[in-house]
Amino acid sequence: MRWLNRNVLGIGIADLAADANYEMVFAVLPLFITAGLGAPAFAVGLIEGVGDGSSAVVKLWSGWYSDRIAWRKRLAVGGYGTTVLGLGLLVAITTWPQVVVARALAWMGRGLRQPIRSAMLAGSVEKKDLGKAFGFHEALDTAGALIGPAAAFLLLSSGHDFRAIFWVALIPGAVCVVLFALITRDPRRERPDPVSLRVPLPAGFWRLMLPVGVFGIGNFATAFFTLRAAQIMQPELTQAAALSAAVGFYLAHNAVGAAVSFPAGWLADHVGKAPVLAAAYVVFAAACVVGVVGHGWFALGLMALLVGAQNPVVSSVEGSLTSSLVEPRRLGTAFGVLNGINGVADLASSVVAGALWTFVGPAVALGLGSLLCASAGVVLWVRQPKPV
């Protein structure tokens, strides 16, 4: 089986458009919430947390359910469409509590399709090619995450307001739904066996979930780094210029991610998935340290490099490592659990980080994130799970 096949390419291209959609929105959303709607940083954490929590619940169900049906694709298409609908509501929003509803709806759609998409991707290639397939997908995914913020940066710099950006973001959102529906196919797989579906997931998988959960609690949303980017540039720039610099940080971190995604997948196939993932956890810890002590353009660039380097590596290698630990017929359930744990951890992370950021200070929030993520990297390195 060729690893670069119709499904790998189709899922990748569709997610390129999907990421252009929501990353265009997310590049400016924390700035829209704080500068546009006048909300505190705590509101950013609450919005991120509610979105991640609602997504986690849906992920657990969709992964479990997709192992019991033969038509995963239809559910995934519905998930893509729901995300576009939720983000589209932002064009009419006037208060930050309304953002909570729109963000939750959008991320429920993401939760519906994410485990299914990952299971479809894993079911489309042989195990020896999982790293390359997930790395290629993440590279296209991150390319979309580069296009979206670039468009947001250009629109914001040319005098357009936040709502104009939300309107433009609907275009790639609609494109992603159409592309996924037309190009991808449900991979052939064994008929679901009710007995095998009741067998517990293997011990190696649960061994991985411990560092995944610890990292997730420390790995707060990139929105906080965007806020921090604006803060560390405020002494040198006007507020408007600092906001543009923060969007530039978001764009730069996605550019780094696009560059490292595929090489990281190749490296994971040849060096080992667990060591590469552990290293990515530690890189995020280093990014938090830079956010605490750094100032000016150098800190902004270094923070973009570190945050950008770890993000796609974590996403792709967690997926390929999970695929190597679980039998194909249980992949939907496994990805549901993986994404569910990540979602619950992200909920805790965003709410705690937002509260600490608002009531204690950014340094404490970033310091706690660094400690937790470094600990997760050490645990994963010492207790590496064995593939099935």
Positions of the model-derived regions?
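Helix-loop boundary and gating motifs at the non-cytosolic
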Residues: 2-52, 207-242, 246
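Transmembrane alpha-helix termini and helix-breaking/packing motifs in multi-pass membrane transporters
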Residues: 31-36, 147-164, 348-364
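Residue-level signature of mid-helix packing/kink "hotspots" within the transmembrane helices
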Residues: 52-60, 146, 254-262, 343-347
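Helix-to-loop junctions at the C-terminal end of transmembrane segments
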Residues: 58-71, 259-272, 357
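Structural signature of the two symmetry-related core transmembrane helices
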Residues: 74-88, 170, 275-290, 370
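Helix-loop junctions at membrane interfaces in 12-TM secondary transporters
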Residues: 91-102, 292-303
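Intracellular juxtamembrane helix-capping segments at the cytosolic ends
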Residues: 112-125, 313-326
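C-terminal membrane-cytosol helix-exit motif in multi-pass small-molecule transporters
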Residues: 170-190, 376-384
